[in-house]
Amino acid sequence: MPELPEVETVKRGLAPAMEGARVARLELRRQDLRFPFPEALADRVSGRTIVGLGRRAKYLLVDLDDGNTLVSHLGMSGSFRIEEGAASAMPGEFHHARTKDEKHDHVVFHLEGQGGPRRVVYNDPRRFGFMDMVRRADLAAHPFFRDLGPEPTGNDLGAAYLAERFRDKAQPLKSALLDQKNIAGLGNIYVCEALWRSHLSPIRAAGTLVTPGGKPKEKLGLLVASIRDVIADAIAAGGSSLRDHIQTDGSLGYFQHSFSVYDREGQACGTPGCGGTVARIVQAGRSTFYCAACQK
């Protein structure tokens, strides 16, 4: 599943090709992805101008000039490919190379704009992705978004906010951080990395980072800073390039080579002077990587 940095990378790669362009035709090559397409989606998008691209959590937002927003989720293996004539480029790559097999091309944006015609192709072998059309004014109240917490790099995420959310919680810290109601867009990879950077165990109770009076402990502030830093580093690196996620220009992001604990089971911990070994455990069906020696 793509995490926030991967979706942000895709958004930034698509923006030069899509923003300001007119959708001459939206071509749907099947009736559904994970869910059926909205009724008359092709007719509603064709002829419209794309006024901007955005992102909320792990969702890509395509704003149209009629006040509607096309909401897209990449699912497990979705990717976008930009084609201009015989040339093609892809924004976001990840461990297993994404396929360019045209039999998995399910949605094609035929665009007109400066620089001539181009196509933006959505490819999704597993078809776990989906698209929906939402009035822009209604986005915040839509079921996809209404319960989401603040963005991990936004001003609303702070130690005081997390103290309020975590107070008296016996829930494991990692599970609390993955709860999208607490923080939007934060996923398994970056939670593992942020916990390592802040020397916090994924299995400790979230409430242990809050004083009896409800104030954040010092380590909670360090955790917030680590979350911000690891997300910013991954975005700057173009995403983690893990498994199925490809950048629009086809380049391999380098953040995966900077992982400190994720997917490093049995390797030495990188904390200076630690001497511990990265371990893998399973929490709520997901792999957790951490160093028990320095993460407490």
Swiss-Prot record:
EC assignment: 3.2.2.23, 4.2.99.18
Record has DNA damage as a keyword: yes
Active-site residue list: 2-3, 58, 286
Annotated keywords: DNA damage, DNA repair, DNA-binding, Glycosidase, Hydrolase, Lyase, Metal-binding, Multifunctional enzyme, Zinc, Zinc-finger
SUPFAM superfamilies: Glucocorticoid receptor-like (DNA-binding domain), N-terminal domain of MutM-like DNA repair proteins, S13-like H2TH domain
Pfam families from the UniProt entry: Fapy_DNA_glyco (PF01149), H2TH (PF06831), zf-FPG_IleRS (PF06827)
GO biological process: base-excision repair
Zinc finger region(s), FPG-type: 260-296
Residues engaged in binding DNA: 104, 126, 169
Chain ranges passing through the membrane: none
Single GO MF annotation: class I DNA-(apurinic or apyrimidinic site) endonuclease activity
Domain of life: Bacteria
Keyword hit for Cell membrane: no
Catalytic activity: Hydrolysis of DNA containing ring-opened 7-methylguanine residues, releasing 2,6-diamino-4-hydroxy-5-(N-methyl)formamidopyrimidine; 2'-deoxyribonucleotide-(2'-deoxyribose 5'-phosphate)-2'-deoxyribonucleotide-DNA = a 3'-end 2'-deoxyribonucleotide-(2,3-dehydro-2,3-deoxyribose 5'-phosphate)-DNA + a 5'-end 5'-phospho-2'-deoxyribonucleoside-DNA + H(+)
CDD domains referenced in this protein's UniProt entry, alphabetically: EcFpg-like_N
InterPro entries (alphabetical): DNA_glyclase/AP_lyase_DNA-bd (IPR015886), DNA_glyclase_Znf_dom_DNA_BS (IPR015887), Formamido-pyr_DNA_Glyclase (IPR020629), FPG_cat (IPR012319), MutM-like_N-ter (IPR035937), Ribosomal_uS13-like_H2TH (IPR010979), Znf_DNA_glyclase/AP_lyase (IPR000214), Znf_FPG/IleRS (IPR010663)
Cofactor binding note from Swiss-Prot or TrEMBL: Binds 1 zinc ion per subunit.
Disulphide-bonded residues: none
Cofactors demanded by this protein: Zn(2+)
Entries under PROSITE patterns matching the protein: FPG_CAT (PS51068), ZF_FPG_1 (PS01242), ZF_FPG_2 (PS51066)
NCBIfam families xref list: fpg, PRK01103.1
Self-association and partners: Monomer.
Role this protein plays: Involved in base excision repair of DNA damaged by oxidation or by mutagenic agents. Acts as a DNA glycosylase that recognizes and removes damaged bases. Has a preference for oxidized purines, such as 7,8-dihydro-8-oxoguanine (8-oxoG). Has AP (apurinic/apyrimidinic) lyase activity and introduces nicks in the DNA strand. Cleaves the DNA backbone by beta-delta elimination to generate a single-strand break at the site of the removed base with both 3'- and 5'-phosphates.
Protein family (similarity comment): Belongs to the FPG family.
Protein's recorded name: Formamidopyrimidine-DNA glycosylase
Organism: Rhizobium etli (strain CIAT 652)
The encoding gene: mutM
